[in-house]
From Swiss-Prot:
Domain of life: Archaea
Identification of the protein by name: UPF0758 protein MA_1979
Motif (JAMM motif): 177-190
InterPro entries: MPN, RadC_JAB, UPF0758, UPF0758_CS, UPF0758_N
Organism per entry: Methanosarcina acetivorans (strain ATCC 35395 / DSM 2834 / JCM 12185 / C2A)
């Protein structure tokens, strides 16, 4: 069988481009192999690596990035679907060049948490418990809904709160939940949950900075109330 007709699937696993990328990283592959992973299949006449080698013999990387679908389909074996895949990859690369990451929101006080969360929580009909995961500069890395419904210690378990904290390499956590009644005064259950999570954070070396309860146009900081120490 001719080499260019050997299906990629029939190659030894250690020689397949996708498996090599997973094992050794994308930098270990040739341009034709990388493009082959994108296109996935060749034609009846040749395998995908042979097809990609022909494409790259006709267009260098720069030229390929600028070729539109109409031009790409002039290459034998490249239909509209494959041409669209190539165009999409290079368009993503162009967008990466101009991408500017939005600055992370920094939390300096309970008032900052209230300003951020109140517009989204004021009309909630059920209690929603949310955690904000922060970096060492108190910038928000991630926001996550932990539970919906009446807050109690059996629902809000430290495992659920700190799992994401560890995955995000968070330095600290701020907890937020709402009181649909409009009164942000902490209940006995609120205090118990807070104390349980503070102790869990100490064991893992993750600071619980505060637990903010949001009511109707006002809030309570359990740190200010002395329950977060």
């Amino acid at each position: 069988m001719e080499v260019n007709k050997v299906r990629i699937h029939d190659l030894p696993e250690e020689d397949r481009p996708r498996e090599r990328l997973i094992r050794s990283g994308p930098e270990s592959l040739s341009n034709a192999e990388l493009l082959g992973i994108v296109l996935r299949t060749g034609s009846k006449e040749e395998n995908v690596i042979s097809l990609c080698s022909r494409i790259l013999a006709e267009y260098n990387i720069k030229q390929l990035s600028l070729a539109n679908v109409s031009r790409l389909t002039q290459v034998h074996g490249v239909g509209k679907a494959k041409a669209a895949q190539i165009a999409a990859v290079f368009e993503l690369a162009r967008r990466l060049e101009t991408f500017v990451e939005e600055p992370k929101r920094k939390i300096c006080s309970p008032k900052d948490v209230y300003a951020l969360m109140y517009p989204r929580m004021r009309e909630q009909k059920k209690e929603k418990f949310i955690t904000l995961y922060l970096d060492t500069k108190n910038q928000i890395l991630k926001e996550e809904v932990v539970s919906i419904g009446s807050l109690n210690a059996s629902i809000v378990h430290p495992r659920e709160v700190f799992k994401s904290a560890l995955l995000e390499s968070s330095a600290s956590v701020i907890m937020v939940h709402n009181h649909p009644s409009g009164d942000p005064s902490p209940s006995r259950e609120d205090i118990m949950v807070t104390e349980k999570l503070v102790e869990g954070g100490k064991l893992l070396g993750i600071d619980i900075l505060d637990h903010i309860i949001i009511g109707d146009g006002r809030y309570v900081s359990l740190k200010d109330e002395g329950f977060v120490r």
